[in-house]
Amino acid sequence: MATPELMLSLGLIEKDVNADTLWVWCYPSIDADLREVMLRKCCLTLDNQVLHTFVFGQFCRTWYYITTVEVQEPTVLKKVTHFSIVVTAKDFNPEKYAAFSRVLCRTYMKHGSPVKMMEGYIAVLTKGICQSDENGSFLIKDYDVRKALLAGSLKDVVSQFGMETIILYTALMLKKRVVVYHPRIEALLEFTRALPCLVWHRKDWSILHPFVHLENDELENLKVCTGYVAGFVDPEVKDRSDLFDVFVNLPDSEITVSQNAKEAMSMGKLHKEIGNFIVQAAEDADRSDAQVIKDISVKTKEILSNLMSLADHADNSKLTLECLKQGHYPPATENFLFHLAAAEQLLKI
């Protein structure tokens, strides 16, 4: 069960009748750098933009969830046209925080006071529940972390990219940098959140940065990460080869491997075999997304146990290139296993 202490803060951004967008309140606190990033993400600072009702992402190891609404009558908010509720947390669980934020939005629309929102926030922190007759209720134990991790659809990813999904699988297995572009943030969030499922054995969603702007503070934050899945709505990201090993153009269904990653990402018989396996599993109408993820994970564990068995015979259970050569693998397979051993920290340096 997700624990209430995972929430870090609650914030409120308003756009007034003069079209000014400002931070108006937060509890207990949000630092200035994060506030600046949240203003950029909330869509209220942009002119003539479509309203993005819910976005999420990660900055400096903090997850943020932003729900934005247009003020509707009847309301006590006479000078406000739109507002965004910002929740920051330690955990990845978009559905949980979207549901909680909807309750907070209704509360603020009705009362026009952050105090009422703070009461709801504290109730969830202390009791795991926030109840109200007119604004709806929220129960934290309804939102299981595993469900959040499984909510992205790998079957959709495979149906779009087919055999090329093996490029994404290889990149994630080797902890490479994957950049995904789509002009529509909703499509970007839906696609990117599914990719860590390809490496389910790690259950590591900290690699996910689904909504990044081409701004220095965000790019510097990204560059300190070893490998990642980063989503961008700006088409100029395709020219930023310093940011990616693999570039995914979602609208055009194209995947490109950058020049500097081609050696580590070279494909062979093993890749073809895994690629076929992934496609067959995903195309089976009787199999759910969760079953497809499990199938791929079992296949991955087979590969890793083969690596481990080689390492068992080696010095300190660490692999060397010489150990791998004893397996007499084809060059592309040997190359992949060598880079995989490095990614899994099984390599003797």
Swiss-Prot record:
Q: Which GO terms describe its biological process?
A: endosome transport via multivesicular body sorting pathway; protein transport; regulation of early endosome to late endosome transport
The dDENN domain is annotated at 296-349
Name one molecular function that GO assigns to this entry. Answer: guanyl-nucleotide exchange factor activity
- Limits of the uDENN domain: 1-135
* Keyword entries, A-Z: Endosome, Guanine-nucleotide releasing factor
Question: Is-annotated flag, keyword Disulfide bond?
Answer: no
Q: What is its main location?
A: other
Q: Where in the cell is it found?
A: Late endosome
Looking at the record's lineage, which domain of life comes first?
Eukaryota
Keyword Metal-binding (UniProt): no
The GO cellular component terms are: late endosome
Protein role: Guanine nucleotide exchange factor (GEF) which may be involved in the regulation of late endocytic pathway homeostasis, including endosomal positioning, maturation and secretion.
Q: Which family is it part of?
A: Belongs to the DENND10 family.
Q: What is this protein called?
A: DENN domain-containing protein 10
- Specify the species: Danio rerio (Zebrafish)
Q: What is the lineage of its organism?
A: Eukaryota, Metazoa, Chordata, Craniata, Vertebrata
Gene name linked to the record: dennd10
